[in-house]
Amino acid sequence: MPHHVSKARFAELVERAAATLPAQFASALAEVPIEIRDRPSTRMLRSLGLEDDELLLGLYHGRPRTERSVEDSGRLPDVIYIFQEDVELVSESEQDLIEQVRTTVLHELGHHFGMSEEDLDELGYG
């Protein structure tokens, strides 16, 4: 059964997860804000080849550090989206929710650093 919390509590869990990140990830949060949304938009899902009923826990929107160049100046800033309802759906308890939020934040920050899905799976952030 999904574990639901208030928007304020979920935001607190995201902040706590960000505060406990390994040093190499924590420094990136100054560059990449985290935005909490209830669910991904249809446009976001379609851009990933997903249907409306598929879950998406988080999304990194931007250009990974490994692909940047001087030509990138003036582009929109990177952002990480965390989708509260989908994270809650895969969490059966408060502890599950805490762990899933942290894993999702780490996963999306990994994309910021240029890591692939396979790289993240190997690190346990898949």
Where are the regions that the model predicts?
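Short hydrophobic/aromatic patches at helix-to-coil boundaries
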Residues: 122-126
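Short alpha-helical catalytic segment bearing the HExxH-like zincin motif
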Residues: 100-108
